[in-house]
């Protein structure tokens, strides 16, 4: 059966972004350090339309996280743009340019309705104003039997974790302290249904994969 998979980079003190996030600084102060391990990987650069890159112990982790995904769910904060209702005078299309790295349907959970946004490379953003269960139902239909990825940010990840809807979770732990920002596990509580199944130590990061028991 197709799975719901979640992967995110996190600091040692549990944050997935730094403090003082803004449109100008979407990762917050120091937040770029969460992803330094990834951005030079060949397996990260390829779906972004970039050539070259490194191959190391993180390569297989990244390739595995991208393989078999048929649809992605994210929150409004990850998609970005100014908060509140969408501004037709400033038609925000995400952080990723004309050809985003997803190359499949993406469902953005938001309080504000907006028509679907089709971009190059097979990525279409659909804006879901219903609950997370409806967003997942739409993503499953679009994925056509493949897995669904929950991309973040922290608040949407928390919602799916608290609802017990995540089958696999990959935490890429970066050796930095942010001191504030979005805490991944704020209000989530224990997750007894998930067990550690793999640990990979790589340059600048340690990857922990958890899977549903049974």
Where are the language model's segments positioned?
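Enzymes that bind and transform nitrogen-containing heteroaromatic metabolites
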Residues: 1-214
């Amino acid at each position: 059966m197709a799975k719901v998979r979640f992967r995110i980079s996190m600091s040692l003190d549990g944050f997935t972004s730094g403090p003082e996030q803004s449109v100008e600084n979407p990762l917050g102060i120091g937040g770029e350090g969460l992803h330094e391990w990834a951005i030079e990987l060949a397996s990260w650069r390829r779906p972004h339309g970039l050539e070259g890159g490194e191959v190391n112990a993180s390569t297989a982790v990244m390739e595995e996280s991208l393989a078999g995904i048929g649809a992605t769910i994210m929150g409004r904060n990850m998609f970005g743009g100014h908060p509140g209702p969408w501004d037709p005078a400033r038609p925000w299309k995400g952080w990723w340019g004309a050809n985003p790295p997803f190359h499949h349907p993406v469902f953005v959970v938001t309080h504000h309705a907006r028509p679907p946004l089709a971009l190059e490379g097979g990525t279409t953003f659909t804006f879901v104003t219903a609950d997370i269960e409806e967003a997942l139902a739409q993503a499953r239909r679009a994925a056509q039997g493949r897995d669904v990825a929950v991309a973040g940010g922290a608040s949407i990840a928390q919602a799916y974790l608290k609802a017990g809807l995540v089958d696999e979770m990959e935490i890429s732990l970066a050796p930095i302290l942010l001191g504030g920002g979005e805490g991944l596990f704020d209000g989530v509580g224990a997750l007894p249904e998930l067990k550690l199944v793999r640990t990979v130590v790589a340059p600048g990061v340690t990857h922990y994969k958890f899977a549903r028991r049974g």
